[in-house]
Amino acid sequence: MSIAKGKNALLVASSYYGPFYPDGKNTGVHFSELLIPYNVFKKAGFNVQFVSENGSYKFDDHSIEESKLGDFERKVFNDKNDDFWTNLNNMKKASDIVGKDYQLLFVAGGHAAMFDLPKATNLQAVAREVFTNGGVLSAVCHGPVLLANVKNPQSVEGKTVVYHKHVTAFNKAGEEKMGVMDELKKRGMKSLNEIFAEAGATFIDPPNPNVNFTQIDGKIVTGVNPQSAKSTAEAAVSAL
């Protein structure tokens, strides 16, 4: 029997799709950071519902380049009959979601997350409800930016759900290695190291921005990059 049979998971995507990269390509939600966790949760027995702030999504241009797809990702990307697409095309907007119906929330990344998730008040409300009801909040790469903006309803001081938690995410060293830190700065955006420091979290840098690296602190589970998508999703299942 599947370990999560009868349980429900929310898989969160950014709704933003637009200019970001120095080469003129657009950012959106990262393809493999949606697909890989979806596969983990389905195998574990979860009912999976995709959601974004306004019910729309588009993939980050670089994340669907042929050279960026592994064998599994390429197979699913080219097979539009795969149930991944059926479920993805049933994406809901956050205002239509009842958070208490879900035991786990996972946020995919892509730099797009930095554009809309800090202001995605409906997604933040859903995440808060999942957390209040004892659910797991998990995210990978740039997805953790949502968690840094979710207030803990049990905190009278209005602290975030990541306050005094050990977290990780795509860090400043990674942005610099990609050559996009200046792209963030000129849009008035900070690195995730800075964002989590302001949210009262303890940010744990990976030994290298490109390695598989995950942090688990109670019901808060975070990962660094696409390489960490599988391990972060698996850790979220275990945390539940």
Curated annotation (Swiss-Prot):
Function: Catalyzes the conversion of methylglyoxal (MG) to D-lactate in a single glutathione (GSH)-independent step. May play a role in detoxifying endogenously produced glyoxals. Involved in protection against reactive oxygen species (ROS).
Species classification: Eukaryota, Fungi, Dikarya, Ascomycota, Taphrinomycotina
CDD domains tied to this protein: GATase1_Ydr533c_like
Catalytic activity: methylglyoxal + H2O = (R)-lactate + H(+)
Alphabetical list of Pfam families matching this protein: DJ-1_PfpI (PF01965)
BP terms from Gene Ontology: cellular detoxification; methylglyoxal catabolic process to D-lactate via S-lactoyl-glutathione
Gene Ontology annotations for the cellular component aspect, listed alphabetically: cytoplasm; cytosol; nucleus
Keywords of this entry: Cytoplasm, Lyase, Nucleus, Stress response
Protein name: Glutathione-independent glyoxalase hsp3102
Catalytic residues (UniProt): C141, H142, E175
First-tier enzyme category under EC: lyase
EC number(s) reported in the record: 4.2.1.130
